[in-house]
Amino acid sequence: MSTESMIQDVELAEEALPRKTAGPQGSRRCWFLSLFSFLLVAGAATLFCLLHFGVIGPQREEFPKDPSLISPLAQAVRSSSRTPSDKPVAHVVANPQAEGQLQWLNRRANALVANGVELTDNQLVVPSEGLYLIYSQVLFKGQGCPSNHVLLTHTISRIAVSYQTKVNLLSAIKSPCQRETPEGAEAKPWYEPIYLGGVFQLEKGDRLSAEINLPDYLDFAESGQVYFGIIAL
């Protein structure tokens, strides 16, 4: 049997089928299409309502209710955002022009001394009694490791009005070199940041200083790497 004769037989068989069966099949197909369209529209409307009323979607960041679980810096940010900006605050930066010393500047675009705080003799003078967040960061940079052990220190000190003695509030020591660079080997660069921060009860007239032991290793390549500041809570 040829292919053409098989096709003709199939066409004749289709013509021989009762024409009345086409009616119920068409009605059933229309019913299914209507049901599918209804479910699609209902699902889209439900999803829109859930998104609109916040039942689903990105979760909001929540702060813990226990204040002890919040870092001092986070508490300072929350406190300052809810109160008028009349609290003492200072953020000073290092002078990249001062060779061999760490000198703080307040007359820069990214520096601030306000609401009674003063920068005197490279120290921040506290204008009123209260809790303060004190912070500072330095960045050291070097090339290779010498034979003598390199110890980098960063310290925040306080000279209180009640007793004229310098007392360390925060201090850290780091060593960037574990071993001496072998003779003839490539001297690779190293970087060592030190950050200090904490909350302290201060008195009016207290003086605060942030100091290091090896200023020749300070990195001033980018602004905002070496700074010192206080925020009244």
Swiss-Prot record:
The chain crosses the membrane at residues 36-56. Pfam families: TNF. It comes from Macaca fascicularis. Cytokine that binds to TNFRSF1A/TNFR1 and TNFRSF1B/TNFBR. It is mainly secreted by macrophages and can induce cell death of certain tumor cell lines. It is potent pyrogen causing fever by direct action or by stimulation of interleukin-1 secretion and is implicated in the induction of cachexia, Under certain conditions it can stimulate cell proliferation and induce cell differentiation. Induces insulin resistance in adipocytes via inhibition of insulin-induced IRS1 tyrosine phosphorylation and insulin-induced glucose uptake. Homotrimer. Interacts with SPPL2B. This is Tumor necrosis factor. Belongs to the tumor necrosis factor family. A lipid is attached at K20 (N6-myristoyl lysine). GO terms for molecular function: cytokine activity; tumor necrosis factor receptor binding. GO terms for cellular component: cell surface; extracellular space; plasma membrane.
